[in-house]
Regions:
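Conserved Rossmann-fold cofactor-binding substructure of NAD(P)-dependent oxidoreductases
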Residues: 31-53
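N-terminal Rossmann-fold NAD(P) dinucleotide-binding loop
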Residues: 3-4
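Conserved glycine-rich Rossmann-like NAD(P)H-binding loop of the short-chain dehydrogenase/reductase
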Residues: 15-26
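Catalytic helix-loop patch of NAD(P)-dependent Rossmann-fold dehydrogenases
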Residues: 68-83, 90, 94-95, 104-149, ...
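C-terminal substrate-binding subdomain of Rossmann-fold SDR/epimerase-dehydratase oxidoreductases
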Residues: 174-303
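Conserved NAD(P)H cofactor-binding loop of Rossmann-fold oxidoreductase domains
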Residues: 58-61, 100-101
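A hydrophobic alpha-helix adjacent to the NAD(P)-binding/active-site core of NAD(P)-dependent oxidoreductases
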Residues: 32, 46, 73-74, 88
Length: 303
């Protein structure tokens, strides 16, 4: 999802892009190496001929999946990251942008999460991303590899048909006429950042040497699940049937972030949640129902 936005942006900027992915996405403009990021031979093939910089987005990103499959999460998120760092160093990479998460910090200890927050993850997903951050720190200190760590909040935008995050789940429920289940009371709050704004941060992380270490990438505006539901109803003109289920283990009750460091480094996010949501709905409303049900298909945007 995020990778398609980043690849599209980099190609538009004239960069030569090579992609490593478990799943084949036929695209004549991209040199694709299909395989597991934890496989050193795959990475050596992908990085043969040298590389200027690496964007590391490959991960198990679902909190629920990480709790169901912690070993797989560790293999992909930790072993894969370690293998990529070693292969990237050997290939002469000058910089690496790493997609991390604010889930590395666990419960909030201050009015807003900043880069100085204590790392205290609550789930295998958060823990493996924290381990990835430590590997980035070690490679910077030991080998001089500049690593820009992006602590992303909830990313949404066009092309998220296969995702299980709240915006995708809401869109799917509206198009298919289903009931939307809220985990808990719906008052838990999250920050939402548009994929295009994340892509802009990634581009800065690749090109600006002042981007090193962690930076919080979020809108700075948090919304409760109930507020997101209201916003979706306003954009789509549809009132969803809602049920409440139990809260999820390891879920943070609040994510409120302060992106001041990223802003000071030149990041300039453009999308309000409402404007971004309108674009997401425009895409979903044009999809046929079979594609929605299957979690595939896009209209006029990177997947």
């Amino acid at each position: 999802f995020i990778g398609r936005h980043v690849v599209s942006h980099l190609l538009g900027a004239g960069a030569r892009v090579k992609v490593v992915d478990l799943v084949a996405h036929p695209d004549p403009s991209v040199d694709l190496v299909q395989g597991d990021i934890a496989d050193r031979e795959i990475l050596e093939e992908a990085l043969s001929g040298g590389v200027d910089a690496i964007v590391h987005l490959a991960a198990v990103t679902s909190v629920l999946k990480s709790m169901e499959h912690p070993e797989l999460t560790y293999r992909t998120n930790v072993e894969g990251t370690n293998t990529l760092l070693a292969a990237g160093r050997a290939a002469g990479a000058g910089a690496l942008v790493f997609a991390s998460t604010n889930a590395v910090t666990g419960p909030m200890e201050a009015p807003a999460i900043t880069e100085s927050a204590t790392l205290r993850p609550l789930t295998p997903y958060g823990a493996t991303k924290a381990a990835g951050e430590m590997l980035m720190s070690a490679y910077t200190a030991s080998f001089g590899l500049r690593c820009a760590v992006m602590r992303l909040t909830n990313v949404y935008g066009p092309g998220m048909q296969a995702k299980d995050s709240i915006v995708a789940r809401l869109m799917r429920a509206i198009r298919l006429g289903g009931t939307f289940e809220i985990y808990g009371d719906g008052r838990q709050v999250r920050d939402y950042v548009h994929a295009a704004d994340v892509t802009a941060a990634v581009r800065l992380g690749l090109t600006d040497e002042s981007w090193a270490g962690p930076a919080v990438i979020g809108s700075g505006r948090s919304l409760s699940v109930l507020e997101v539901l209201d916003a979706v109803s306003q954009v789509t003109g549809t009132e969803l049937k809602v049920t409440h289920g139990p809260g999820r283990p390891g879920e943070m009750p609040a994510v409120i972030v302060d992106p001041s460091r990223a802003l000071a480094l030149g990041w300039d996010p453009r999308y309000s949640f409402e404007d971004g949501l309108a674009g997401v709905w425009q895409e979903w409303s044009a999809l046929d129902l079979d594609a929605v049900a299957a979690g595939v298909g896009t209209v006029g945007a990177p997947r």
